Amino acid sequence: MTPLRLDEGGRELFALHLTPPLGRASGDAVVLCNPFGHEAIRAQRFYRVLGYRLAAAGLHVLRFDYHGSGDSGGEDADFDVHGAVADTVRAATELRRRSGVARLSLLGLRLGAQIAYMAAQALAAERLVLLEPLLDGELYLRQLEAAHQAELDMAFGPRWAREAALRAFNAGRDEALGFALTPRCREQMIAVLREPVRACCRSVLVLSDDAAVAARWGGIDGVRCIASASGVDWTTSDSLNATLVPPAWIELVLRELSPEPAHA
């Protein structure tokens, strides 16, 4: 595993390049695209396990943080969707250069699925894996707001119901579970999820148990939808240190991206 710092025009990204074992490189590479904010923390262990398994199966794997998130440069208020797409394109281009592979795949969870889909079009990616992709930006923002308010309620206890001034102080919509959520980012989340989806890769795998997700993606050439849920509430801090690794997803992704059958 090689840590990387990618700096272009002061927009610094932190990445980890996982390489396949000697003699097992398949000629394939995959970039893992994080979800938004707190959800990226929830998904960290899942991405780590998945990255190691994919590398062991022969793929070059890149995990990275968007500018304004994780260990990359910038403040969290610097994050927005279009910037994250550009970061993904830059990270994937660097992975192609370092690995020398021709076949590139992208994988993303929730908002990361939308980012992966948008970046795949610019990269002419071979394959795309979308894990519980979002459908509606306004609905997603309401869910984030509800989760944020629930966390405040839990943190402040009886004071939350009793003290109107406390609720008013925390009533802004510029934060979600400890991460900045700027008006620009909110607007972009709504706008990009309103755009109709279209064919972009030779093969697209969608994992979600939401029938509306299957309806949105299922009629597109090259798309295969599997009704499979993570079983994880990505927007809560409950059991934050628990093992949030959906085992069925690991096997389905390995089967989709591995050049040969995966072995446990």
Question: Language-model features: where?
Answer:
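An N-terminal hydrophobic leader/cap segment in hydrolases
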Residues: 1-23
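Catalytic nucleophile-loop/oxyanion-hole region of alpha/beta-hydrolase
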Residues: 69-103
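The alpha/beta-hydrolase serine catalytic core
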Residues: 124-264
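Terminal, non-globular segments
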Residues: 5, 15, 62-63, 256-264
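Short glycine-enriched nucleophile-adjacent loop
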Residues: 113-124, 128
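Short, surface-exposed "cap/lid" segments of acyl-processing enzymes
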Residues: 10, 20-65, 94
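Gly/Ala-rich beta-loop-alpha elbow adjacent to hydrolase catalytic centers
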Residues: 107-116, 132
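Alpha/beta-hydrolase active-site loop signature
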Residues: 37, 66-71, 135
